[in-house]
Amino acid sequence: MTRTSKWTVHEAKSNPKYFTHNGNFGESPNHVKRGGYGKGNWGKPGDEINDLIDSGEIKTVFNKTRRGSNSQNNERRLSDLQQYHI
């Protein structure tokens, strides 16, 4: 009787080495450092579009005016009805 703990009690299953030994804690192992602004400041995918718009090579795409809501249209119609005289 040299052992006091039973062999039937097992510890929790450990995480795979892939997740425990690569990168920082709580990060996926294939995480890109600084969100893509890596060595040489090469930027994130899609940043080149803003550069092309600024240089004038392509036109701006998001130049639509904001649509009014239905409540604004309804208010205008009600005010027109109230101002209508027979």
Swiss-Prot record:
Superkingdom of origin organism: Eukaryota
Residue positions where Phosphoserine is found in the record: 28, 79
Predominant subcellular localization, coarse grouping: cytoplasm
Subcellular location: Cytoplasm; Nucleus
Residue ranges, annotated region (Disordered): 63-86
Keywords per UniProt: Cytoplasm, Nucleus, Phosphoprotein
Transmembrane segment boundaries: none
Disulfide bonds: none
Entry's Gene Ontology cellular component terms: cytoplasm; nucleus
Subunit and interaction comment: Associates with ribosomes.
Similarity comment: family membership: Belongs to the STF2 family.
Function per UniProt: May be involved in inhibition of the reverse ATPase reaction of mitochondrial F(1)F(0)-type ATP synthase.
Other known facts: Present with 504 molecules/cell in log phase SD medium.
Full protein name: Translation machinery-associated protein 10
